[in-house]
Amino acid sequence: MIIFAFLVIILSGFIQGTTSFGFSLIALPLLGIVLSLKLVVPLLVIFSLLMNSIILYKLRSHVDLKRILILIFSSIIATPAGAYLLISIDENILKLFVGIIVVFSAIIFKLGFSIQVKNEKLAYIPVGIMSGLLNGSVSLSGPPVILFLTNQKAEKQVFRATLTSFFWILNIATVFVFSYNGLINYEVLNLSIKLFPALIIGLMFGMKLGDRIQQKTFQNATIILLFCMGTLSILGSF
């Protein structure tokens, strides 16, 4: 079990280090095969915070604080409304809807179609709102931000820095909430220590590839991960 989990964390950390997203996308369903989700989810939150802290420090010169704050503030404001959506609408319907949009967008991007938004700072408001709605309803805060940055053909380091900053702040909030509710316990911390070397191995190799990979290859990898994310969301709705 530990060997399998070790390999999963290496792979997931590698993906995260390269693209700045996709860690939970890979790790959650695979680790869920051999471990309880009560262990897996807090573990992934802790590891995500650690990874994003390291990546963010390395990419700090590419962070646009004003844009990030707009994105975060809009997301926080909309999260309670997302929770209301979860109460009002079936969760599976929301997952299906999000999955279809993400898959369709990935296909469109792959075909080379995009609509460039000139005022990006202003556009971060609706993007943040959509992210907050999805975060509060189905815990999928990433797709709106990833889709927007992909549409804008953001330079890979700007893409990674923006996404990492956004997730880093969400990670901090989530760790506090999980700790308060007793979800981060001795068992979770013990498993975190055992798997920590795997995280570092995967992350370091991923970050090296992320620095060397060509912009076009980076965009293609992002689109593939988006397609996988959307597909898993659709499958998870049934």
Where are these regions (language model features)?
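Small-residue-mediated transmembrane helix hinge/kink sites in multi-pass secondary transporters
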Residues: A83-I87, L147, M207
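Small-residue-enriched transmembrane helix starts and helix-helix packing motifs
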Residues: M1-I15, N119-L133
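Glycine/small-residue-rich loop that forms an oxyanion/phosphate-binding "nest" at active or ligand-binding sites
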Residues: V63-K110
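Small-residue-rich hydrophobic segments that form or flank transmembrane alpha-helices
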Residues: I3-L69, G142-L199
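Transmembrane helix exit motif
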Residues: N52-S61, F97-L122, M207-K208, G230-F238
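Hydrophobic alpha-helical transmembrane segments in multi-pass integral membrane proteins
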Residues: L85-L86, N135-L140, T174-V175, M229-F238
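Membrane-interface helix termini and inter-helical loops of multi-pass transporters
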Residues: A83-I93, F178-L191, L235-F238
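Interfacial loop-to-transmembrane junctions
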Residues: M204-L225
